[in-house]
Amino acid sequence: SEAAAIATPTATVTEDSGATGDSSDDGDDGEDSHATRHLLESVALEHYADKLRAAVEHSSQAIEDYGAKHREARGMGATVTAALVMDGQAFVANVGDSRTYLLRDGKIERLTRDHSLVERLVEAGQITPDEVYDHPSRNLIYRSLGAGHAAPEVDIFVEKLRPGDTLLLCSDGLWEMVRDPQLQQIITEHDDLKKACERLISAANDNGGEDNITAVLVRCLEA
């Protein structure tokens, strides 16, 4: 079992005054500055998302390379969910069925989408979300790092953060054992993130603990 807790100040996109060009007296300065700011923000968003995607792809290739050199590790795979918090935004990468949640104003919301058979069944209306937890095929995934997927398709989600927001990154060993209402309750009841992580892992073990359990909590503070 693994647990981690992080608190980070929320940041804002800053603008270099030299990037807006020369000033003029034609009354368009405000509009030009506003447009330039949006352009800078868009470029920054794409940059961070691309860097995060590249890091995940590099990790997948590293797993493939290791498997090629070690016969016992051939076909080895992994899932990943990762968050990069920059400029007041959370950039979340996901491959497989690990998850990232957002807790805001006491309510929990899943940001990621599982690359699993049961997720597709839910989307098709063939099973309910609650039936995922007991479905015999709940561990079948169609995307992973390694396992013959040197360049997996990486989902990237972007969420603008507010002070007080909390991100939970976790493996299926947590969310399959601790359902969303209990995740929400535990995180809400603990201001100390380390204690909240420990309680999440204890709850997963108390509920059966069928798999490895990883939980990471990240809380955004005032800048």
Residue map of PLM features:
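PP2C/PPM-type serine/threonine phosphatase catalytic domain
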Residues: S1-A223
